[in-house]
Structure formats: structure tokens, C-alpha cells
Amino acid sequence: MTSNLGQPQAFFKKTLVPVLADLRLAIVLLLAIALFSISGTVIEQGQSLEFYQANYPEEPALFGFLTWKVLVTIGLDHVYATWWFLSLLILFGTSLTACTFMRQLPALKAARSWQFYKKPRQFGKLALSTTLDPDQKPSLLKALEKNRYKVFEEDQSIYARKGITGRIGPIIVHASMILILLGSIWGSLTGFMAQEMIPSGTTAKVSNIVKSGPWSGAQIPRDWAVQVNRFWIDYTPEGQIDQFYSDLSIVDEDKNELDRQTIHVNQPLKHKGVTLYQADWSIAGVRVQLNNSPVLQLPMAPLEAAGGRIWGTWVPTKPDLSAGVTLLTTDLQGTVVVYDESGKLVSTVRTGMSTDVNDISLKLVELVGSTGLQIKSDPGIPWIYAGFGLLMIGVIMSYVSHSQIWLLTADDQLYVGGRTNRALLTFERELVEMIESSASDSALSPSTNPQPQEVA
């Protein structure tokens, strides 16, 4: 009775692994990953359903088929966290691993072995080969060593090689790409992204999570909060925004300061693996004084306007709230326009100035800004950075030529031949120069040691 226990193992080794190690499969997977990565860059990620319904309507559909329903159904609104994108990464990593063990490591093993040519006809398969006087052998060996070749001798055969680094480079490239893939997958599973709009002078916990992985709970901060000490904007002389800043403190549950930094665009605050980016801004409120009353802080709400961003609030001017004025502003430069109940422009005031309206004095004390923070944690980033560092090293190493030269003394002739995996013209020039430099040297008796040995 024949056992079938070995059939799955045979299928794995003889069918599945060769398919995974096929370069064509790796190229197809890489192109698919690149295509979907581009789509994730072009299509806004992590937005609300209303956003996609407004920007990707069913009529007319983008490119004739791309509607909000297609985006949401396939997962193009969160490409990098979808099961199929992660599956592509895993499959690509598996293909690279199989290729490394099936092709690159055996190639390295073969390159490190001593390959002696014993018969003159073996030189016929080399792209570069010639015959010399046997007297040139000693000087040719010296030339090989001078050009940093490792020389091995067995009887009348010589094998020399250099540039084994060029065979290690592709393995490092594969390993680095696998490391990058692992970092991307780990970041998708354990990372999170939150967005917070925090008024100046207030404290808030990280709560508005817009994207998170299934294992991200440990990364979301629970024992500390963000305190905005101050938020301000620098403007150009033309009135355009130059840069906006947030003076942030990380505080624990007892309000003890754990960390503090002033951040701006491209200069984030990092704390315990969580990065806080300056992403947006808004106007939270306005502080006003009516006659000699205490200073009142009123919230300001964003309003729809064709000309840009605008914020507004309503200030009552009578105790029974039967009358009031509307305050509007477009920035934090301290200028506010005042309108009465009929929509008529009453005045334009700046911070510290007063205006008379409805028989009272209204003083603009301060505009209160809000900082928009993007708070992220991606535990896979160190892996990705390490992978890219290794990738650059591996690419540089791959450009090193692996060159091999064989010598054989037979039939009163010295057979010389060589090959390289890149830079053929440079290798040919080097070989010719070594042959020419040895043309006038005296002969050296060949070694008769039966065991391979490295010539010092």
C-alpha cells in the first residue's frame, strides 16, 4: 500500500515553491502593489462617507466606473489597511523569501566554491579566453594578487575570484525589502491616527481616532494628554500665512508636565512612540467686553463662504437677548468686522479697540485660536527605515562585479579565461593588462599539492 503522506510535501517543494520563486510573479506582485499604492495617494484616505459621496458621485462616474460605492466596497478609501492589500504584501514577501532561498543563496554558495578547470576544452565556453606561454604563469599570479583576486591552486589548475560582495548584495536587497514589507504590515496592524482640534489654553486626551489597526490598543495613549499652552500664526507682510505654531505640553493625569515642545509644520513632537504633527488651525472663540462687564469668551463657528475660510459668532447687546451684533473674522491677525441685526456693517475693530453699537461699548479683547493636530503612531516605522538603509547598502553592493579567472597548464600551454557578471569591458581591459604585464616574466614551477589551497 502506497502512502500519500509525502504528496503534500512534494507538491510544496516541486510545484508551489518554484512558482513563488518565479521572478515574473514577483514583478507582477510589485506592479500591483505600486498601482494600489498610487491609488491610495491619489484618492483621499480615511475621509467621511459624505466626502466620497460629494467628490465621487454616481453620475457622472469618474473614468466611467469609479463612484463612491465602488471606493467604499473595494476599500480604496483605506487602501493600506485592507485585507487584500496586506495579502499582496505577504504574498510578495513570500515570493522574495522563496527566491532568496531557491536562487540567491545557491548562487552565493556556488560563487564561494572553488571551481577548477581540468581540461582545455572547458575554456571554450568562456567569453574571454586565450593561450599563453607557461613561463608567464608566476608573474600572472602576482598580477592577480595585485588586483585583489583571491587565488586558489590545485595541481596544474588555478582559480581566482574577486567581488564576492556583488553576490551578497542581491540577498541583502531581498532581505531589506522583506523587512520593509514586515514593517508596513506591522504598522497597519498596530498603528493608529487621530485628529484633534484643541483651543489654546486647554487640555485634551487623544480620543478622535480616525484610523486604527486591530492591535493598536496598546499604542493609543491613556495615561497622558495634550495641553496647548499657546497657539499663534506668523503672517507675511501681504497678510498670507507664513507658519503656524503650537506650544504643547504632554501632561499626566495629575497635570504634571512630562514633555514640552513648540511644534510647527514639519517639526513634530514625539513622545513614547506617538508623534504629534501640526496639521491645521481654526478659531475657537473671541473674548469681548461689553461696557464694564467681565470679559466674556464666546465660541466662533466656521461658516460657509465662497471667498475662503470665515468664522462668526453672535454677541447679545441686551439682557433679554432681543438684540445683538454679529462678529466675523477670517484669521488671527486681530481684525473683526461687526454687523447689526439687519446685516449692515457697523464697524471694523482690532484687538484692544472698542466700538459703539446699540448704545453700548463693545471691546475686542482677544481672538482665541485652535490648533489642529494629527497624532500618529506607527510601530513599523523603525523596521521600514532599517529596511531602506539596508536596501541602499544592498544596491551599492550589487554593483560590485563578481569576476572569475581560470588558469590551466596543459600541453605545454597556459590556458587563461575569465568571466564576470557585469562591466564586461572593464573586466576585459583588466585581464588584458594583467596578461601584458606578465609577458616578460620568468616561469615559476606549478604547485603539486593535491589539496586545494589559497595562495598567500
UniProtKB/Swiss-Prot annotation:
One GO-annotated biological process of the protein: cytochrome complex assembly
Q: Does the keyword Metal-binding apply?
A: no
Organism whose genome encodes this protein: Acaryochloris marina (strain MBIC 11017)
Q: How does this chain assemble? A: May interact with CcsA.
Entry function: Required during biogenesis of c-type cytochromes (cytochrome c6 and cytochrome f) at the step of heme attachment.
InterPro entries of this UniProt entry?
Answer: Cyt_c_bgen_Ccs1/CcsB/ResB (IPR023494), ResB-like_domain (IPR007816)
Localization of this protein: Cellular thylakoid membrane
Q: Which UniProt keywords apply?
A: Cytochrome c-type biogenesis, Membrane, Thylakoid, Transmembrane, Transmembrane helix
* Top-level division of the source organism's lineage: Bacteria
Its placement in the membrane is given as:
Multi-pass membrane protein
Thylakoid listed as a keyword = yes
Q: Gene Ontology cellular component?
A: plasma membrane-derived thylakoid membrane
Q: What is this protein called?
A: Cytochrome c biogenesis protein CcsB
| Family, per entry | Belongs to the Ccs1/CcsB family.
TM segment ranges? 23-43, 82-102, 168-188
